[in-house]
Regions:
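Catalytic cores of secreted/periplasmic lytic hydrolases that degrade extracellular macromolecules
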Residues: 1-115
Length: 115
């Protein structure tokens, strides 16, 4: 079994729950998790339970959100830290659903793979 398949199997329940709650196809969530977290093996995923590379905004920090500091695009960037992988999946779904940049994605049927 490949690392991608192992990740998908391990986190499928999280992705399916988010699909039912927010309408984001589980396959899309898992694919992004695989890429962003290097199959759950990135430092960000292992240390912060952050599987999607979501950066900590000033409002996240002001609201008491935890964060870790990592060098990514720039040195010493702040990334959200979660108590659990489930919290990471939940925040990812809300991030997509509430961000106007992704609004067009939700105009498509969840099973429309052509767009």
């Amino acid at each position: 079994m490949s690392k991608n398949q192992e990740y998908a199997l391990q986190y499928a329940d999280y992705a399916m729950a988010q699909m039912r709650r927010y309408g984001i196809p589980a396959s899309v969530t898992l694919a992004q998790g695989i890429l962003e977290s290097s199959n759950g093996q990135s430092r960000l995923a292992r240390n912060e339970n952050n599987h999607f590379g979501i950066k900590a905004t000033p409002s996240w920090i002001a609201g008491g959100g935890k964060y870790g500091i990592y060098t990514d695009d720039k040195p010493n960037e702040k990334f959200c830290s979660y108590d659990s992988v489930g919290d990471s999946y939940e925040h990812h779904s809300r991030f997509l659903k509430e961000n106007s940049r992704y609004a067009g994605c939700f105009k498509l049927s969840p099973d429309d793979y052509k767009g």
